[in-house]
């Protein structure tokens, strides 16, 4: 019973710490940087939508699409080697718009 009570009292503190660590869209502020360059390895599911689309990785193409975190929409244009670049509007929507 005493250990359950201690855990119950610690839970709000743990949740507060997690909220501080992951409560922002700014990747650098979160401190959990992930790969945004396709040439450096495979892209994670998060990087497909959360990498800054303005990172100039590779050539720019108006044939590509990227996900804009601010508008929560897929938009035309992207950099070929940026993980947040999709070959079609449909691919971007399927990966990112929920």
UniProtKB/Swiss-Prot annotation:
Keyword DNA-binding: no
Species of the source: Rhipicephalus appendiculatus
Paired cysteines (S-S): 36-51, 43-83, 49-96, 74-92
Superkingdom, natural source: Eukaryota
Signal peptide start-end: 1-23
GO MF assignments: potassium channel regulator activity; serine-type endopeptidase inhibitor activity; toxin activity
Protein name from the UniProt record: R.appendiculatus Kunitz/BPTI-like protein
Chain's role: Activates large conductance calcium-activated potassium channels (maxiK, KCNMA1/KCNMB), when tested at micromolar concentrations, suggesting a potential mechanism for regulating host blood supply during feeding. Shows no antiprotease activity, and does not prevent ADP-, PAF- or collagen-induced platelet aggregation. Has no effect on blood coagulation and does not inhibit the alternative or classical complement cascades.
Organismal lineage: Eukaryota, Metazoa, Ecdysozoa, Arthropoda, Chelicerata
Subunit structure: Monomer.
Tissue specificity remark: Expressed in salivary glands.
Localization annotation: Secreted
UniProt entry keywords in alphabetical sequence: Calcium-activated potassium channel impairing toxin, Disulfide bond, Ion channel impairing toxin, Potassium channel impairing toxin, Secreted, Signal, Toxin
Gene Ontology, cellular component aspect: extracellular region
């Amino acid at each position: 019973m005493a250990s359950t009570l201690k855990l119950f009292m610690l839970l709000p503190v743990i949740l507060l710490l997690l909220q501080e660590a992951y409560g922002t869209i700014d990747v650098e502020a979160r401190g959990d940087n992930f790969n945004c360059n396709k040439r450096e390895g495979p892209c994670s599911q998060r990087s497909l939508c959360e990498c800054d689309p303005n990172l100039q990785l590779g050539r720019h193409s108006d044939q590509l699409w990227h996900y804009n975190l601010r508008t929560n929409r897929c938009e035309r244009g992207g950099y070929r080697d940026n993980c947040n670049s999709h070959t079609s509007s449909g691919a971007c929507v399927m990966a990112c718009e929920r």
